[in-house]
A protein has these predicted regions:
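Gly/Ala-rich phosphate-binding loop of Rossmann-like dinucleotide-binding domains
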Residues: 4, 108, 136
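A conserved segment at the C-terminal end of the G1
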Residues: 1-15
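Conserved nucleotide-binding/hydrolysis micro-motifs of P-loop NTPases
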Residues: 17-19, 67-68, 121-123, 150-154, ...
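C-terminal lobe/tail of nucleotide-utilizing enzymes
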Residues: 137-202
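Inter-motif core of Ras-like GTPase G domains
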Residues: 86-89, 101-122
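Conserved C-terminal guanine-recognition region of P-loop GTPase G domains, centered on the G4
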Residues: 125-140
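P-loop/Walker-type NTP enzyme "switch/lid" segment
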Residues: 12-87, 184-189, 193-194
Length: 202
C-alpha cells in the first residue's frame, strides 16, 4: 500500500492454491472472479484477471485458483506470466503459502527476491530454516528474513531473541513487525492497517 501511495503500480499475486485468502485481507473477495490459472491457460488476459482495489487503483490483486487438485504449472508459462507482470507493473508482491508445495515452487520460480516471514515460535523458526535451505539457489543478498508478531513479553517468556531467529534461518534480517491485536481485526474485515494508523503499520 505504501508503494501504491507513491504512485507505483503494484500487483499482489496470491500463490496459495486452494486456500487463497489474500482477497479477503484486501477486501476484494467479491470481485476476484478470475485467477492466475485462467491467465496461464489463455482463458483471459492478465489485465482482465487482475482486480484493482476500489480505493487504491494502482494496487491490484491476481488471486489463486480454488482448485481441488494440483494444477499443471509449466515453467515456460510461469516465466511468460512473470515477463508480462514485469512489463505491466512496477512491483509484484507474491504471497507464497506455508510449506514447500506447488504454490511455493511457483512463487520461487517467478521471484527475483525473497522475504521469509517467521515468528519467534520454535516451530516457525524451524520452518524458516527449511524454507531458506530450499531457496539456496537464489543469489546471495536476494533472500532476507522478517520476524513478525514480536512482543517484549513473549520474548522474555520464551527466552528467545531476534538473534535466535536470524541464526536459525541463516538469513540477514530485513525487519521486525511488532505484535498488534488490531491486525487480525483488520484482516477479518478487509480493512487497511495504514488507514487506521494502527501500531504495526507505523
Amino acid at each position: 500500500l505504501a508503494l501504491a501511495h507513491m504512485g507505483q503500480r503494484v500487483l499482489c499475486l496470491d500463490c496459495d492454491i486452494t486456500l487463497r485468502n489474500l482477497d479477503l485481507a484486501l477486501g476484494l473477495s467479491d470481485r476476484a472472479l478470475m485467477d492466475f490459472s485462467d491467465v496461464l491457460e489463455g482463458r483471459c488476459t492478465l489485465r482482465e484477471a487482475a482486480v484493482p482495489h476500489e480505493r487504491y487503483p494502482s494496487l491490484s490483486l491476481l488471486t489463486a485458483p480454488m482448485a481441488d487438485r494440483p494444477l499443471s504449472l509449466s515453467v515456460p508459462k510461469l516465466q511468460a506470466l512473470a515477463r508480462e507482470i514485469r512489463e505491466s507493473y512496477d512491483w509484484c508482491l507474491i504471497d507464497a503459502p506455508a510449506g514447500l508445495g506447488q504454490g511455493f515452487q511457483m512463487a520461487a520460480c517467478m521471484a527475483d527476491q525473497v522475504i521469509v516471514i517467521t515468528t519467534t515460535d520454535v516451530s516457525a523458526m524451524r520452518d524458516a530454516q527449511r524454507t531458506a535451505a530450499e531457496l539456496s539457489a537464489f543469489p546471495s543478498g536476494t533472500v532476507h528474513l522478517v520476524v513478525g508478531r514480536v512482543s517484549k513479553k513473549v520474548l522474555r517468556q520464551l527466552h528467545t531473541t531476534i538473534d535466535d531467529a536470524i541464526d536459525a534461518a541463516g538469513l540477514p534480517l530485513l525487519g521486525v513487525i511488532p505484535e498488534d491485536p488490531d491486525v487480525p481485526y483488520c484482516l477479518n474485515r478487509g480493512l487497511v492497517l495504514r488507514e487506521q494508523n494502527y501500531y504495526a503499520a507505523r
